[in-house]
Curated annotation (Swiss-Prot):
It comes from the Archaea. It is an enzyme of class 4 (lyase). Disulfide bonds: none annotated. The active site is at D126. The gene is moaC. Its EC number is 4.6.1.17. Gene3D superfamilies: Molybdopterin cofactor biosynthesis C (MoaC) domain. It catalyses: (8S)-3',8-cyclo-7,8-dihydroguanosine 5'-triphosphate = cyclic pyranopterin phosphate + diphosphate. Catalyzes the conversion of (8S)-3',8-cyclo-7,8-dihydroguanosine 5'-triphosphate to cyclic pyranopterin monophosphate (cPMP). Belongs to the MoaC family. Keywords: Lyase, Molybdenum cofactor biosynthesis. The keyword Lyase applies. This is Probable cyclic pyranopterin monophosphate synthase. Coiled coil: none annotated.
Length: 159
């Protein structure tokens, strides 16, 4: 281990050995926010975005991202996920996305939750590009921000 990093030693980069760990209930919750024009948030709530159902698309994208996290983050272990929930809270000029991931396994699921929330936010951006662009084709208001883990659980039961 180099400087307290579990993925690096004197031989280089490695995937951490977890074979000796017990299988326990794991949960992680991550949140993030996309700032949008108030008019865009209203259109999403009313289901009037021409490209399609923004929230359903974001949910599917987030769930797929959770399942593919070890393909995107090189040193993540493939984890048998037991459940994923992607939910939304609305403000006047933003949508906050929450991704909750659950599993019974030997290592945590926080990277999966972070990946899920980030890709869900990116999917929202993709779905609303046409209404968020200004006259020069730029996105002066649109921002993805504050992606973070809000809860991490490790317990020998699911409560």
């Amino acid at each position: 281990m180099v400087g307290g990093l579990t993925h690096v030693d004197e031989k280089g980069v490695k995937m951490v050995e977890i074979g000796y760990k017990d299988v326990v209930f794991r949960k992680a919750v991550a949140k993030g926010r996309i700032k949008l024009k108030p008019e865009t948030v209203k259109l999403i709530k009313e289901g009037k975005i021409e490209k399609g159902n923004v929230l359903a698309t974001a949910q599917i994208a987030g769930i797929l991202a959770v399942k593919r996290t070890p393909e995107l983050i090189p040193l993540c272990h493939p984890i048998p996920i037991t459940g994923v929930d992607i939910t939304f809270d609305f403000g006047e000029d933003y949508i906050e996305v929450t991704c909750e991931v659950r599993a019974y396994y030997k290592t945590g699921v926080e990277m999966e939750a972070l990946t899920g929330v980030t890709v869900a936010l990116l999917a929202i951006w993709d779905m609303v590009k046409a209404v968020e662009k200004d006259e020069k084709g730029q996105y002066p208001y649109t921002r993805i921000e504050n992606v973070h883990v809000v809860e991490k659980v490790k317990t020998h039961n699911s409560q």
